[in-house]
Amino acid sequence: MTPEEWTYLMVLLISIPVGFLFKKAGPGLKRWGAAAVGLGLTLFTCGPHSLHSLITILGTWALIQAQPCSCHALALAWTFSYLLFFRALSLLGLPTPTPFTNAVQLLLTLKLVSLASEVQDLHLAQRKEIASGFHKEPTLGLLPEVPSLMETLSYSYCYVGIMTGPFFRYRTYLDWLEQPFPEAVPSLRPLLRRAWPAPLFGLLFLLSSHLFPLEAVREDAFYARPLPTRLFYMIPVFFAFRMRFYVAWIAAECGCIAAGFGAYPVAAKARAGGGPTLQCPPPSSPEIAASLEYDYETIRNIDCYGTDFCVRVRDGMRYWNMTVQWWLAQYIYKSAPFRSYVLRSAWTMLLSAYWHGLHPGYYLSFMTIPLCLAAEGYLESALRRHLSPGGQKAWDWVHWFLKMRAYDYMCMGFVLLSMADTLRYWASIYFWVHFLALACLGLGLVLGGGSPSKRKTPSQATSSQAKEKLREE
């Protein structure tokens, strides 16, 4: 592990005992104590580069104050434009930010765009109420008022997920501050249930990254190896990549769980990133609060089993970095300037690549996803429904195998970063995923498969059952 990885791990582990300290605190101590810890971590790891986060926050707050009815689009433009400046600092002869500064900036961008959207929703709801002339019950998830500058700063610098996620909305943050009877919200048992696989994943990461180092792919000697070896190598590289993020995100979730952050009654049917989808009145007494069943779906960032064993490329995205996937779906996919599912996905993947950075490998990887989505969608629509139950089961196993190989292939661009290294590796295995995806897409079109945006995927309604079948076997 690199020194940076050790620092990330220490930050994640420290957040767990800190969470237990804040869990039963009052709203004021939670707000300002959590912000002080987060600001301290930012200053410690980023130093003077912390100024970038402050500039981004102040700029967003100014836009919210100036144009509350359109601040969402303005905040998106501002924060994404600042990301470009932030990443071009070395080209401008300015000090290059640390990797920790980049991590803080990435999560801060998501939070501020979401905050602007929540403020815009509040402003539009207030205008609608004034126009109608009567008071209505507040909409689920609506903010009670526009946050002040200090409240915006406290949300932005809250230590929870400050470098690794999970992403959370201001409404989720506010619910944590005002959580009734926090002592009734379970933390220790959910934390232990969530944390138990992390040590195993950590050991698997250390073992796989040691046996199959990524740096080997950048050496000339690697390309003298036989084709089967080159093909196989992407599998352990992606495996190590997954194990690394599994550990990081599970630890980050445990930090939230320790603080009771993102806990809602199961009846609220909370979604990762978005929070509750059903209105659930707060408990009126400690006894009622203790009788409720809670979950932490709002801050769930990774479904390890779903990532590894879901059947389709499309589903694989949903189980990975789940809170960020919600953000992308809510603020990018829904407002994409296209109607086609594949084109909307391409637009979303393009902006996701930009959010991650300017390395060409990000774009090569992310822009391969829409091709895979189109290929699996058209071919599945054309063929799978005509198969027998046994044939569909075999189809799903083959589909799962190819889905995993596609992600292995795309991961190489994400970790190699440069265009030269990525294309060199892909060329050494003859761009086989691209060619296979094009062949499947062509076959699906010839056989009359429907567009993914205009049909219901035959396995969509039974995706959970298919996943269970894979689990059983």
Curated annotation (Swiss-Prot):
Lumenal side of membrane: 23-33, 94-194, 262-426
The keyword DNA-binding is assigned to this record: no
Cell compartment(s), UniProt: Endoplasmic reticulum membrane
GO CC terms of this entry: endoplasmic reticulum membrane; membrane; mitochondria-associated endoplasmic reticulum membrane contact site
Domain of life assignment: Eukaryota
Alphabetized InterPro entries for the sequence: LPLAT_7/PORCN-like, MBOAT_fam
GO molecular function: lysophospholipid acyltransferase activity; O-acyltransferase activity
Entry's transmembrane regions: 6-22, 34-57, 74-93, 195-212, 232-261, 427-447
Phenotype of gene-disrupted mutants: Knockout mice die within a month and show atrophy of the cerebral cortex and hippocampus. Embryos at 18.5 dpc have a forebrain smaller in size and show disordered cortical lamination and delayed neuronal migration in the cortex. Mice with conditional knockout in hepatocyte develop hepatic steatosis spontaneously, and hepatic fibrosis on high fat diet feeding.
Record carries keyword Glycoprotein: yes
UniProt KW keywords: Acyltransferase, Endoplasmic reticulum, Glycoprotein, Lipid biosynthesis, Lipid metabolism, Membrane, Phospholipid biosynthesis, Phospholipid metabolism, Transferase, Transmembrane, Transmembrane helix
Membrane topology: Multi-pass membrane protein
One of the GO biological process terms: phosphatidylcholine acyl-chain remodeling
UniProt-annotated glycosylation sites, renumbered to this chain: 321
Pathway field: Lipid metabolism; phospholipid metabolism
Region (Disordered): 451-473
Family as reported in the entry's similarity comment: Belongs to the membrane-bound acyltransferase family.
Subunit record text: Interacts with SPTSSA; the interaction facilitates MBOAT7 location to mitochondria-associated membranes (MAMs).
This protein's name: Membrane-bound acylglycerophosphatidylinositol O-acyltransferase MBOAT7
